[in-house]
């Protein structure tokens, strides 16, 4: 019987050597927001604690400045 092994998650920011997450980098921040506008937790993305805090702060700043939506499109 074959066992399914889940691929180990890793922090993308540590691997790429990114030291600071900028709130103006909207394309990067969109990858860490769910379809309904919530911040995706680090247990799903594999982001380390340090960068998850920076990510949350950057997303909140971008939302405040209307670069990102608070919620999804209600239709």
Curated annotation (Swiss-Prot):
InterPro entries recorded: Ribosomal_bS18 (IPR001648), Ribosomal_bS18_CS (IPR018275), Ribosomal_bS18_sf (IPR036870)
Entry superkingdom: Bacteria
Gene name as annotated: rpsR
Xref: Pfam families: Ribosomal_S18
One cellular component term from this protein's GO annotations in UniProt: cytosolic small ribosomal subunit
Function according to Swiss-Prot or TrEMBL: Binds as a heterodimer with protein bS6 to the central domain of the 16S rRNA, where it helps stabilize the platform of the 30S subunit.
Biological processes per GO annotation: translation
Keyword terms: Ribonucleoprotein, Ribosomal protein, RNA-binding, rRNA-binding
Intrachain disulfide bonds: none
GO MF annotation, one: structural constituent of ribosome
NCBIfam families hit by this protein: S18
HAMAP family to which the protein is assigned, alphabetical: Ribosomal_bS18
Subunit structure: Part of the 30S ribosomal subunit. Forms a tight heterodimer with protein bS6.
Name under which the protein is recorded: Small ribosomal subunit protein bS18
Family: Belongs to the bacterial ribosomal protein bS18 family.
């Amino acid at each position: 019987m074959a066992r399914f092994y889940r691929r180990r998650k890793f922090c993308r920011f540590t691997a790429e050597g990114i030291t600071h997450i900028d709130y103006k980098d909207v394309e990067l921040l969109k990858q860490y927001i769910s379809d309904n506008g919530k911040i995706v937790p680090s247990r799903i993305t594999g982001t380390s604690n340090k960068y998850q805090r920076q990510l949350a702060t950057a997303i909140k700043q971008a939302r405040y400045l209307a670069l990102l939506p608070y919620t999804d499109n209600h239709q």
